[in-house]
Amino acid sequence: MRFQRRAMTLRQRLMLTIGLILLVFQLISTFWLWHESTEQIQLFEQALRDNRNNDRHIMHEIREAVASLIVPGVFMVSLTLLICYQAVRRITRPLAELQKELEARTADNLAPIAIHSSTLEIESVVSAINQLVTRLTTTLDNERLFTADVAHELRTPLSGVRLHLELLSKTHNVDVAPLIARLDQMMDSVSQLLQLARVGQSFSSGNYQEVKLLEDVILPSYDELNTMLETRQQTLLLPESAADVVVRGDATLLRMLLRNLVENAHRYSPEGTHITIHISADPDAIMAVEDEGPGIDESKCGKLSEAFVRMDSRYGGIGLGLSIVSRITQLHQGQFFLQNRTERTGTRAWVLLKKA
């Protein structure tokens, strides 16, 4: 029959280790004291036999005896403290490893902590953290699934209502254009809710890869973005630089990020204006979208990236575009900035990403 080895607590390890160290050095000190005392007694006896019992000689022998005890005692205490420090450092090493593991994690890394220790407290803390992370992951997954299911269930009836309105307009010559426009806004809002729910699923499965911003993100999105801008006679200008910029991330999410930036510029820019995409790699990767709109109130830039916050309610939307951009940027461990252009009126929205 095999018995499972019982894990020792951190307190027990410290007490046992320090106790053994003190016991060993106490035995050494006792032996040293006995050895020196025996030697001094023999010297005194020899001095008495030789009639060298004058005060000067006695004080000299006393000083030698005290020195022979103090100097080794100081050395032994110092050595004891040093060894105790090394022992405590070795025993608490799992705590330091746990600290490094937690500090190195990003906010989106919800994988279980893989630290194995024979110390009871460390095992309990790691187990509790892993259980908390598991519950948090389950809650977030359920929230994403609920949002995606609700948005998906809304798209089907909205599409049916739009189809019926188009048939009503053709058969009964009824002006339903305002209703169709409102339905289109609702369907766009539902699509954004779906995007917000799905953002991060690729990263949660570790789907990291090298992505070229021009070749894998901007050019594949050009036709879709250009079609969107043509509805308001706007022009999309691509980067002039021939050099591509490579980052590490998810191409699908970065295309979603770019689409939301361009869509936001398209919504708030006048008709017939230009929307420009820039990329650079000095020193980190930058992807920027500039428009020729009225600009923004820079004191409110922090709130504009929050969910359901809009720049201007006159332009429609539900305020999820920049929130999606901010979320995708965080997943790529980057930074999102929003500011007014300096050379002319307009807004510059750009993300700072780490190069591969």
UniProtKB/Swiss-Prot annotation:
Induction cue: The eptA-basRS operon is positively autoregulated by BasR under high iron or aluminum concentration conditions.
Catalytic activity: ATP + protein L-histidine = ADP + protein N-phospho-L-histidine
PROSITE patterns the record matches: HAMP, HIS_KIN
Compartments it resides in: Cell inner membrane
Keyword Calcium set for record: no
Name of a matching Pfam family: HAMP
Disruption phenotype: Abnormal expression of genes encoding virulence proteins. Decreases fitness in the spleen and liver of mouse.
GO CC term, one of those recorded: plasma membrane
Record PTM Phosphohistidine, positions in chain: H152
EC number(s) reported in the record: 2.7.13.3
Described purpose of this protein according to its UniProt entry: Member of the two-component regulatory system BasS/BasR. Autophosphorylates and activates BasR by phosphorylation. Plays a role in the adaptation of the organism to the host environment, in particular to neutrophils, and therefore it plays a role in virulence as well.
Name by which UniProt lists this protein: Sensor protein BasS
Organism: Salmonella typhimurium (strain LT2 / SGSC1412 / ATCC 700720)
